[in-house]
């Protein structure tokens, strides 16, 4: 109990010994002045790190088109080249429908029936 009283007296003495200054007044906020009109732009940011490799310029984009449109195809006849070259008439209208020239999909197979395995059991 004596220790508690001594600690309480010590805390009161320490609190009363501290100076009681008033808090400082808050500083007024002022926005920074705008930059003059002849100010230089900020420098560009440094290039990103390449982890020890030298920086290489990016390649130019590749354009996968022809510089001009293809001429209109004549629908009169096509030259078929083979063992015996010949000329065959080609239609001017493309054929649409019937799967667009692709074969039918592969058929689905049924699962084996259970009685096919019964012949092996005795």
From Swiss-Prot:
GO cellular component, one term: extracellular space
Signal peptide as annotated in the record: 1-17
Identification of the protein by name: Vitelline membrane protein 15a-3
Region of interest: Disordered: 21-63, 103-122
Intracellular or extracellular location(s): Secreted
Span of domain VM: 69-109
Originating organism: Aedes aegypti
Biased composition (Pro residues): 21-49
Keyword Iron (UniProt): no
Family: Belongs to the vitelline membrane protein family.
Keywords: Secreted, Signal
Keyword Secreted: yes
Tissue expression from the record: Expressed in the middle and posterior regions of the follicle cells.
